Amino acid sequence: MFLAQEIIRKKRDGHALSDEEIRFFINGIRDNTISEGQIAALAMTIFFHDMTMPERVSLTMAMRDSGTVLDWKSLHLNGPIVDKHSTGGVGDVTSLMLGPMVAACGGYIPMISGRGLGHTGGTLDKLESIPGFDIFPDDNRFREIIKDVGVAIIGQTSSLAPADKRFYATRDITATVDSIPLITASILAKKLAEGLDALVMDVKVGSGAFMPTYELSEALAEAIVGVANGAGVRTTALLTDMNQVLASSAGNAVEVREAVQFLTGEYRNPRLFDVTMALCVEMLISGKLAKDDAEARAKLQAVLDNGKAAEVFGRMVAAQKGPTDFVENYAKYLPTAMLTKAVYADTEGFVSEMDARALGMAVVAMGGGRRQASDTIDYSVGFTDMARLGDQVDGQRPLAVIHAKDENSWQEAAKAVKAAIKLADKAPESTPTVYRRISE
C-alpha cells in the first residue's frame, strides 16, 4: 500500500518512481481517491524534475490501462492495426485521406480523434460537417466498420484512458501542460488504447505548431517514439512543416471538400500530398505492408489512381450514417457560407511569411471553431484558395477566398488574413515539408 503524499515527496526530492508507485497514483486519479491538489503537486514535480524513460513508459501504460484497451484478435483481421497522430495544425486534413489510403492497401485504422483545440482544427468537427455522420458508434458497430471497411474515425469515449481526462484538466489550470513526459503520456495513453501494432506521429514545426520551437518539437517526437516503442508498439515520427496552412483550405466543410478532391484526383495540393504520402509510407512500412519507401509509394499511388482509396472513404462515410453517395455528390451535401469573396493584398509581392496560428484563430473567430467547449460550430466558414509561401500575389491572385456568415465577419477575417501574411520583393527560400524522420 502506498501513500500519495510519499510518492509526491519522492518525486519532489528528485528520485525516480517505480512502476507500482506510478500505477497506484494513476489508478487513484481514475478512482477519485487522489485529490486534485495531489494531482497538481505531482504534475509540478514532474514538470521540474522530468522523468526517466522507464518512468515515462510506466506512466503511459498506467494511463492506457486506466480504461478499456481495444483488442482486435477476435476479428481475425488479415492485416495490421495502424494509426497516425498529429500534434495539430491549420489545414491539417491528412487523416481524411490517410485512413482510406492505408485501408485500401490492407491496413486497419481504428482512428480515435479529437475536436478542435485552440487554433488547430479537429478531425471530428470536420467530419460532422457531413450530414448525419456519426462519430460515436457503439463498440460493436465500430468493430464491424473496421472489419468491413478497414477504417473508422470516431470520438474518444469515456472508457478510453479515463485517468488522462482528469489529469489533463488539472494540468490545464496549474501551468503544467507543457511538460514533455506528461504530453507524451497523454497522447500515447489514448493512442495505445486502440490496440495498435504500429503508429506514426506527425509532429508539427513552425508558426502553427503546438510546440513553439523546432527543438521542442524534436524533443517531443523523440520522447513519443522512445516511449511508444518501449510500450511495444512500432512507432516512428515525422517532423513536418507548419509555417503555413498545410492544405489550400482551412475550416471544416471546406477541408472535407478538399479531402474528397484529393482522393478523387480532382485537386491535390502538393505540400498536402507530400505530408500525407510520407505519413502513409511510414504506416505501410511499420505495419509490414511494404518493405521499403519505393514499394509503399507505388502501392499508395495505385489506390489513388484506381479509385480504391476514394471508394473506401465513401464506404466509411456511409457506414458512419453519412450519405451513401457523398464522394460523388459532396457539393450537394456540404454546407456553404452565406458570403464567399476573395481578399487581396494591399500591395503586390511574394508571400514571404505566414502566421498559421493567427489564421487558425481567424477561422475560430468566424465561428469555425470553439472558444469554449459549449460553443456551436458554423461548419460552412473558413478559407479556400490560400496563397502559399513563395506565391506572387496582386490584384489578380488573392491571398485567400473567405467563406463567411456575413459582411462584418468577412471584414474581420480579411483584416486577420492581411495581418497574418507578410509580403516581400522576392520569393523566400523554399522550406521542406518533412524536416526529419525519427525512429528508434
UniProtKB/Swiss-Prot annotation:
**What top-level branch of life does the organism fall under?**
Bacteria
User: Which Pfam family is an annotated match for this chain, by its short name?
Assistant: PYNP_C
* Catalysis performed (reactions): thymidine + phosphate = 2-deoxy-alpha-D-ribose 1-phosphate + thymine
Top EC group: transferase
Gene3D superfamilies annotated for this entry? Answer: Nucleoside phosphorylase/phosphoribosyltransferase catalytic domain, Pyrimidine nucleoside phosphorylase-like, C-terminal domain, Transferase, Pyrimidine Nucleoside Phosphorylase, Chain C
Q: What is its EC number?
A: 2.4.2.4
Annotated GO MF terms = 1,4-alpha-oligoglucan phosphorylase activity; thymidine phosphorylase activity
**Function summary:** The enzymes which catalyze the reversible phosphorolysis of pyrimidine nucleosides are involved in the degradation of these compounds and in their utilization as carbon and energy sources, or in the rescue of pyrimidine bases for nucleotide synthesis.
Please tell me whether the keyword Glycosyltransferase is annotated for this protein: yes
The annotated pathway is: Pyrimidine metabolism; dTMP biosynthesis via salvage pathway; dTMP from thymine: step 1/2
One annotated GO biological process: pyrimidine nucleobase metabolic process
Key words, A-Z: Glycosyltransferase, Transferase
Which species is listed as the source? Shigella boydii serotype 4 (strain Sb227)
Provide the gene name from the record.
deoA
Query: Cross-referenced InterPro entries, in alphabetical order?
Result: Glycosyl_Trfase_fam3, Glycosyl_Trfase_fam3_N_dom, Glycosyl_Trfase_fam3_N_dom_sf, Nuc_phospho_transferase, PYNP-like_C_sf, PYNP_C, Pyrmidine_PPas_bac/euk, Pyrmidine_PPase_CS
Oligomeric form and interacting partners: Homodimer.
Gene Ontology CC terms, in alphabetical order = cytosol
Q: Would the keyword Glycosyltransferase be found if you checked this record's keyword annotation?
A: yes
SUPFAM superfamilies the record matches: Nucleoside phosphorylase/phosphoribosyltransferase catalytic domain, Nucleoside phosphorylase/phosphoribosyltransferase N-terminal domain, Pyrimidine nucleoside phosphorylase C-terminal domain
Q: What is this protein called?
A: Thymidine phosphorylase
Q: Which family does it belong to?
A: Belongs to the thymidine/pyrimidine-nucleoside phosphorylase family.
Q: Which PROSITE patterns match?
A: THYMID_PHOSPHORYLASE
